């Protein structure tokens, strides 16, 4: 039906409804609805337009055209009707209400009221406009009157200014005459006048601007407004509001002409007038008003020449006033009174004031210069003031006065001071007397010259400044640096340096982005560092070279290059960097690179321009990068286009100081790390600590008293006496040894007969030696040394030191075999080995068999020889240690014997006479030197001359040198004389050959006729050489004797389950040994594990009793024991034919589910009527259906894709998840997992849950599998998920598959990824992944606000079978990123092998179906592993970046940058659910077909067209099953009502009790708060019904507040 109603008066029709052939017809704007009535209105207007009845109808406020002959109109409250009869038209203005329904009548009356309100508003507006026009006319008249008044005042002002100018001119002439007279007067008293004139000018220069007056006629201060001074200074112009604020007053403020822009002021004034008065722009009245206002505000302008005249005249006037004032004061001597009063006030105590006041009165009476008395009252002590008064009264007795003062002051100082302050008191007295002399002479001079008081003050200040201030400024101070160096610096230099430093700070503070400051070049501080995998940049700091850790890549040796110098150096140490995956490597600075200049640390680290000093790709020519760098959380970010090989380069600031180190680039972002705090902590803090300790020791040393020093001297004297006694005892032993050796040489034959007896008595002698050593240990330290030497020499002669007690045990006892012997024992013959290979045993299996055989052989050996496994079987190492010690003793004794005149021990000993002609021995500390000569008799005389030259006359300490000459029967022995070993040279005259052997001892052999030889041997041994000869322990590197087995055990590195890393007992645990639940501390890991399992278990609700022992795991229940249950299979049951089936394992599990669950508790509620969803049921076909996702489409290999887009996705994904950097490996016993889940096959044959398994068997299997590093495959148990699905999916047997495996495998993955997963749950507000988010408390609104953008559209996408279609290559890539984000200390080869094994078993899976079939599934992310959702989020982010780059490339023919993606897009994701916001300026249109094809062809992933939706706004989008809508200005969620309420009629599981039913209903009510009233009322009704039944049954339920459901959604 055609219907229309007129709209409000003045409204216009929408453009979409305007006729195409012309403008809108008059009267059409009164129609309520134009749909279908335009033609009707045209027809009626054409037919009745001139009729009075039609005109009456058109005078109504609202018109309703009912048909071509009838219309109804409403005016005010009357309803009239228009009709067309055969005889004409009629209009009845009232009584037509019966022709309308109540709703239509109400609607038309509302429209009429609206029109009336609009009419009233127009009338009110017209009245206001008329009143404004009248006010404007009155304002215009007032302005005219104001202009007339201003003109009159202006005339009066001009006359007044002219008169004032004339008076001012006359006043100036009078002042000039007065000034001329003053100058004449000054010439007569030149000294006084000149001094006074200088003071006047100085004073006037200071106060000129404070007392400046405007006396010029043109520049007189205005009564109202500002005074404008002509100036060309470059100052910003004032706005109209500034001029109003400054000049709209009577203060006479000054403004410069350059601040006044007349055109701008007029324009701003007119705009302000338009704003306040409400008229249109360009009103002539406003223009005139603004011109008058500006003239009023700025009435007077002055030139700079006029200001100079003002300055001169005011200065002269001020000088005259001050001069007259001073004359008055001087005439009445008021200056002296003021000075004396000031002097009296300076008295520091009553005694001094009493003594100063008489002096002041005397000085006033005698006309003494006041300044001198003031000085005397300040600098002189009270005791010398009487001499000052005497000098004032009797100035002619100065020498006598000074003499008496000198005697008095010195005597008084001597007798009144104690011994400590005597020197100070006498010095002070002498200084006082000298000051008295100088002061007396100054008073006489001032009185003779009659210098005015002002000149006296200035003269005193100038003298004090020059003598004290300048001298102090140029004085030299001594600065002692921490390294002990001293430096003398003048104070002026310090001030200059301080000013330079301040200027540098100001310069640095003015650094702004966009202006690159200049900086020094620090290329002289960098070198090239080459490691195993590449090269980088190194730089010097202090006395080391530093570079980045990834440059070295674990190399122990690196090559340093600088220009033509190349040195291979060993890495000193690796320093960990806080929150950084890289490290800092320290390399020692060699002497070849001492010329490299060190860098100094920056004083301030902030966003600024930094310089990166590096090399070009050729690593020869140096390059510099400079630009703005941002410092954030200890990292440096910039956009430098760095090259390969720039890693490790230093960042320096504008002063050339070190800020940080370059790590690398990701895309267009270069990244570095700040090193200031690290280097301060590692180096400067240690040096400061050493300096502090040194200073403490120095201070402590200064506290030693004189008595303590004397005590120390007495103790040292006692030691000297003891040393003398020891030396005498040693000399006595030497003489006894000499006699003993002679006796031994005569009885060699007897010794040969007694050898057998000595061997038999060897054990007795060793026991005797042990008792002797015990007695020696009880002796005082001073006698122990001598006794030890005696015993060792004695035993050496007897040949007993070769066997200690322990060595004897090894020699006489049975020699046992070690376990290492059995570990290398051959257990299989060649035939047995070949047979095992033919039978199909793998090399690993054969090795396992051999190891078991070797272990059994070792156990049999222990049993046969009655040896305990814990006995000390390291006898071989201990025996070697004993032999080493014995050899060391032998070497020391032989050296002592040789240096005392004997050869090394042999069967027959010879004296020097038998062996050598000359033997020189020098035994100085740290330098032992011997020279021996063997020659033929014919050259003995020549060597005798050399001997006499070698022995000098200088005396040495007793026992430090021996010189022996043995020729025939004559022997010369000279002791304790300086010996020059260089004088002994071989005599080569007549020699056929001369050969030298420069080894550890330099030997020269001269061969003569008949092969006769002369031998000269020189040997030098130092303490360093002796130290190098010591043998070290192969485990710890120490030379001291100790238990090698214990040392090896403590240094063996083993994997620690608590720390998650490999370390030894010496290194200690990296984590505190505290219980994770109660924080109790423990001494070792075993105690803590026992406590965690038995007393304070975190994983078990009911832990075992403390006395309980865990049972060993039965055979066949281990993680890899499923292979023993595998049987051959004959045919496929549920697995498709294209899937490989490995075998069959019989299991008793549900295969089909055909019946639904019936819950009796649900009879208490009314069912929700829907026919879309139901609980999942399936047949055996469902297992065949679930394999379809693995064969949807084959993905491309990543090698076929452009590496640029792959790198872009990788870089974005790493930056997105950089908060995981440095994540930790959680100990496997501390991982958190659902204990009530199935333990998988084969464990579920015995244990229903992991909780039951842990309570029975404990953690042993977890630790073993982690430690051994398995390579076998675990078995995945597959079952179908029971959930609510669409009935269409249930009919198609399209049920989701869940995979779970052995809990040991799951917790290994949890150890690597649990910490990262928990970090992702904390970052939902600022990152894409939403694991752990909540839609409540404004959660949806905050994410909607984050996604919202003015030019954005929104894409909702949901993949089909997302988990199963993830390409294996992409999944490995994601897992590699997760391993990369671990802390570097966990990235060991062992952990990498464990993680790779874990990842490969996630991809290449062996799966057991409920039908018993065991098959292989390759690819995808199993939907039951520990990190399924987190891994899916990683994949989602990576794919989204790839998708955006793909669409962007299609539109712009280039790839976007990471910054562009972050700026123009944002999204949130949860597993396979994603909501994307894209700016139209980034990607204009979202091509859904291209996206679907891209995912299928590139990745083999399934995206259905129905699962991609594009929205222009956030209203109606869905995420995680909730549709977003607005309520009270905030976004909230609406769930899928039919799906969640279907469980009230068709549940997937039974509820345990009525409380659970009530809780389920409350949860559903909470989710449906934003739904329609029908849903809310239904749930409220069910909750009330259940609550009533619970109350009748006596069950108490919680109470819920009235606003609980609504307020929980809003933030």
Swiss-Prot record:
One of its GO terms (molecular function) is ATP binding. One of its GO terms (biological process) is viral RNA genome replication. Cleaved by the viral and host proteases. The protease is probably autocatalytically cleaved. Keywords: ATP-binding, Coiled coil, Covalent protein-RNA linkage, Host membrane, Hydrolase, Membrane, Nucleotide-binding, Nucleotidyltransferase, Phosphoprotein, Protease, RNA-directed RNA polymerase, Serine protease, Transferase, Transmembrane, Transmembrane helix, Viral RNA replication. Signal peptide: none annotated. One of its GO terms (cellular component) is membrane. The chain crosses the membrane at residues 195-215, 329-348, 353-373, 375-395, 397-417, 426-446, 450-470. Its EC number is 3.4.21.-, 2.7.7.48. The active site is at 550 (charge relay system), 582 (charge relay system), 647 (charge relay system). This is Non-structural polyprotein 1AB. It comes from Turkey astrovirus 1. The gene is ORF1.
């Amino acid at each position: 039906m055609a219907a229309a109603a007129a709209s409000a008066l003045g409204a216009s029709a929408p453009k979409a409804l305007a006729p195409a052939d012309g403008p809108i017809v008059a009267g059409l704007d009164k129609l309520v609805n134009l749909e279908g009535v335009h033609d009707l209105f045209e027809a009626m207007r054409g037919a009745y337009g001139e009729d009075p009845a039609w005109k009456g109808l058109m005078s109504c406020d609202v018109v309703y055209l009912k048909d071509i002959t009838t219309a109804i109109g409403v005016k005010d409250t009357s309803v009239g009707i228009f009709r067309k009869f055969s005889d004409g038209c009629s209009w009845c203005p009232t009584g037509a209400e019966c022709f309308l329904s109540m709703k239509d009548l109400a609607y038309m009356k509302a429209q009429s009221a609206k029109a009336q309100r609009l009419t009233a508003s127009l009338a009110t507006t017209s009245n206001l406009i008329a009143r404004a026009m009248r006010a404007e006319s009155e304002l215009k008249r007032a302005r005219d009157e104001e202009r007339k008044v201003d003109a009159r005042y202006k005339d009066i002002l001009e006359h007044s200014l002219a008169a004032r100018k004339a008076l001012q001119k006359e006043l100036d002439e009078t002042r000039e005459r007065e000034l001329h007279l003053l100058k004449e007067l000054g010439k007569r008293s030149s000294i006084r006048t000149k001094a006074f004139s200088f003071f006047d000018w100085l004073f006037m220069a200071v106060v000129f601007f404070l007392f400046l007056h405007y006396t010029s006629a043109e520049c007189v201060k205005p009564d109202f407004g500002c005074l404008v001074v002509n100036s060309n200074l470059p100052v910003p112009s004032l706005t109209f509001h500034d001029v109003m604020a400054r000049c709209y007053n009577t203060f006479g403020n000054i403004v410069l002409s350059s601040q006044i822009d007349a055109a701008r002021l007029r324009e701003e004034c007119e705009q302000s007038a338009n704003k306040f008065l409400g008229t249109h722009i360009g009103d002539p009245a406003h223009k005139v008003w603004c011109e008058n206002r500006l003239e009023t505000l700025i009435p007077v302008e002055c030139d700079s020449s006029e200001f100079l005249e003002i300055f001169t005249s005011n200065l002269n006037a001020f000088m005259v006033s001050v001069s007259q004032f001073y004359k008055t004061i001087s005439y009445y001597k008021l200056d002296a009174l003021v000075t004396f009063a000031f002097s009296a006030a300076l008295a520091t105590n009553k005694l001094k004031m009493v003594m100063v006041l008489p002096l002041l009165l005397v000085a006033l009476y005698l006309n003494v210069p006041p300044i001198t008395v003031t000085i005397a009252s300040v600098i002189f002590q009270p005791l010398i003031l009487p001499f000052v008064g005497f000098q004032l009264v009797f100035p002619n007795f100065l020498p006598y006065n000074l003499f008496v003062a000198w005697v008095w002051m010195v005597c008084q100082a001597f007798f009144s001071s104690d011994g400590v302050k005597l020197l100070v008191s006498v010095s002070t007295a002498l200084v006082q007397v000298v000051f008295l002399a100088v002061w007396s002479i100054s008073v006489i001079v001032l009185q003779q010259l009659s210098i005015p008081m002002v000149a006296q003050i200035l003269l005193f200040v100038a003298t004090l400044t020059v003598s004290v201030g300048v001298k102090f400024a140029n004085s030299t101070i001594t600065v002692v640096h921490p390294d002990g160096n001293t430096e003398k610096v003048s104070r002026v230099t310090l001030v200059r340096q301080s000013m330079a430093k301040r200027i540098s700070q100001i310069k640095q503070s003015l650094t702004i982005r966009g202006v690159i400051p200049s900086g020094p070049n620090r290329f002289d501080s960098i070198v090239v560092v080459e490691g195993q995998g590449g090269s980088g940049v190194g730089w010097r700091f202090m006395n080391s070279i530093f570079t980045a850790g990834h440059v070295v890549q674990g190399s122990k040796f690196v090559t340093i290059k600088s220009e033509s110098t190349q040195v291979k150096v060993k890495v000193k140490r690796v320093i960990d960097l806080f929150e950084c995956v890289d490290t800092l490597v320290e390399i020692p600075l060699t002497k070849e690179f001492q010329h490299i200049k060190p860098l100094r640390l920056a004083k301030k680290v902030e966003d600024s321009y930094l310089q990166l000093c590096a090399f070009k790709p050729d690593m020869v020519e140096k390059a510099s990068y400079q630009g703005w760098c941002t410092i954030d959380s200890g990292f440096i970010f910039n956009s430098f286009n760095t090259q390969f090989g720039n890693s490790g380069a230093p960042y320096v600031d504008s002063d050339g100081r070190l800020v940080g180190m370059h790590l690398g680039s990701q895309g267009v972002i270069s990244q570095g790390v700040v090193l200031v705090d690290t280097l301060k902590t590692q180096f400067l803090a240690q040096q400061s600590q050493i300096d502090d300790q040194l200073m403490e020791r120095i201070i402590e040393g200064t506290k030693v008293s004189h008595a303590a020093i004397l005590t120390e001297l007495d103790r040292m004297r006692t030691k000297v006496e003891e040393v003398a006694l020891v030396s005498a005892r040693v000399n006595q032993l030497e003489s006894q040894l000499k006699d003993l050796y002679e006796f031994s040489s005569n009885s060699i034959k007897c010794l040969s007969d007694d050898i057998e007896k000595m061997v038999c008595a060897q054990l007795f002698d060793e026991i005797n030696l042990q008792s002797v050593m015990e007695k020696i240990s009880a002796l005082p330290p001073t006698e122990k040394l001598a006794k030890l030497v005696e015993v060792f020499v004695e035993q050496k002669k007897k040949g007993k030191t070769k066997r200690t007690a322990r060595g004897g045990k090894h020699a006489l006892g049975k020699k046992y075999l070690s376990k290492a012997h059995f570990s290398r024992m051959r257990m299989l013959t060649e035939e047995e080995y070949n047979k095992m290979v033919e039978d199909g045993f793998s090399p690993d299996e054969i090795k396992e068999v051999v190891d078991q055989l070797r272990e059994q052989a070792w156990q049999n050996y222990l049993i046969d020889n009655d040896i305990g496994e814990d006995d000390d079987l390291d006898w071989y190492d201990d025996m070697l240690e004993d032999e080493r010690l014995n050899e060391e003793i032998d070497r020391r004794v032989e050296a002592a014997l040789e240096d005392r005149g004997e050869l090394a021990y042999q069967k027959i000993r010879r004296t020097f006479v038998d062996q050598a002609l000359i033997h020189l021995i020098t035994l100085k500390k740290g330098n032992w030197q011997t020279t021996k000569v063997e020659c033929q008799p014919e050259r003995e005389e020549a060597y005798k001359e050399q001997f006499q030259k070698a022995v000098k006359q200088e005396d040495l300490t007793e026992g430090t040198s021996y010189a022996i000459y043995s020729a025939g029967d004559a022997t010369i022995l000279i002791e304790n004389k300086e010996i020059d070993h260089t004088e002994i040279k071989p005599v080569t005259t007549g020699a056929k050959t001369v050969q030298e052997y420069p080894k550890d001892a330099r030997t020269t052999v001269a061969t003569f006729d008949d092969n006769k030889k002369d031998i000269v041997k020189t040997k030098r041994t130092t303490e360093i050489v002796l130290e190098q000869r010591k043998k070290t322990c192969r485990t710890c590197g120490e030379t001291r004797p100790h238990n090698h087995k214990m040392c090896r055990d403590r240094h063996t590195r083993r994997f620690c389950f608590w720390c998650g890393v490999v370390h030894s007992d010496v290194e200690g645990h990296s984590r505190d040994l505290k219980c994770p639940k109660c924080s109790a501390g423990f001494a070792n890991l075993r105690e803590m594990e026992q406590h965690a399992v038995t007393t304070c278990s975190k994983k078990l609700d009911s832990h075992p009793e403390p006395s309980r022992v865990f049972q060993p795991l039965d055979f066949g229940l281990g993680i890899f024991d499923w292979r023993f249950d595998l049987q051959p299979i004959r045919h496929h049951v549920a697995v498709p034919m294209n899937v490989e089936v490995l075998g069959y394992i019989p299991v008793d599990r549900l295969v089909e589910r055909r019946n639904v669950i019936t819950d009796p508790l649900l009879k208490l509620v009314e069912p929700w009527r829907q026919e879309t969803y139901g609980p999942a049921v399936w047949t055996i076909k469902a297992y065949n259906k679930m394999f379809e996702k693995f064969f949807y489409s084959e993905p491309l290999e990543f090698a076929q894709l452009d590496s640029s887009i792959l790198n872009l996705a990788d870089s974005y994904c790493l930056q997105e998840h950089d908060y995981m950097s440095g994540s930790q490996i959680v100990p496997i016993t501390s991982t958190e997992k659902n204990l009530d889940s199935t333990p998988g096959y084969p464990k579920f044959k015995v244990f229903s849950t992991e909780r039951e398994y842990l309570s029975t068997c404990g953690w042993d299997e977890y630790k073993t599998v982690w430690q051994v590093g398995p390579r076998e495959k675990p078995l995945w148990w597959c079952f179908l998920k029971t959930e609510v699905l669409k009935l269409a999916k249930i009919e198609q047997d399209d049920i989701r598959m869940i995979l779970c495996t052995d809990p040991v495998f799951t917790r290994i993955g949890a150890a690597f990824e649990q910490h990262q997963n928990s970090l992702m749950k904390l970052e939902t507000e600022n990152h894409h992944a939403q694991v752990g988010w909540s839609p409540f408390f404004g959660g949806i609104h905050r994410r909607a606000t984050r996604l919202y953008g003015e030019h954005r559209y929104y894409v909702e996408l949901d993949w089909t079978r997302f988990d199963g279609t993830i390409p294996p290559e992409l999944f490995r890539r994601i897992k590699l990123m997760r391993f990369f984000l671990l802390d570097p200390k966990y990235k060991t080869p062992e952990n990498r092998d464990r993680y790779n094994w874990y990842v490969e078993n996630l991809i290449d899976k062996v799966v057991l179906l409920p039908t018993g079939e065991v098959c292989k599934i390759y690819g995808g992310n199993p939907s039951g592993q520990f990190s399924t959702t987190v891994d899916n989020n990683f994949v989602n982010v990576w794919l989204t970046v790839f998708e955006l780059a793909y669409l962007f490339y299609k539109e712009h023919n280039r790839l976007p940058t990471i910054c562009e993606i972050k700026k123009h897009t944002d999204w949130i994701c949860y597993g396979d659910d994603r909501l994307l916001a894209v700016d139209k300026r980034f990607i204009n249109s979202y091509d859904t077909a291209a996206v679907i094809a891209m995912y299928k062809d590139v990745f083999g992933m399934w995206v259905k067209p129905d699962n991609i939706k594009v929205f222009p706004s956030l209203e109606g989008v869905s995420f995680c099953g909730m549709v977003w809508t607005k309520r009270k200005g905030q976004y909230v969620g609406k769930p899928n009502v039919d799906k969640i309420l279907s469980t009230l009629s068709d549940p997937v599981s039974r509820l345990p009790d009525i409380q659970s039913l009530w809780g389920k209903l409350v949860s559903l009510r909470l989710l449906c708060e934003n739904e329609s009233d029908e849903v809310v009322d239904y749930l409220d009704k069910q909750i009330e019904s259940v609550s009533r039944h619970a109350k009748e049954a006596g069950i108490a339920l919680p109470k819920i507040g009235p606003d609980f459901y609504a307020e929980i959604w809003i933030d």
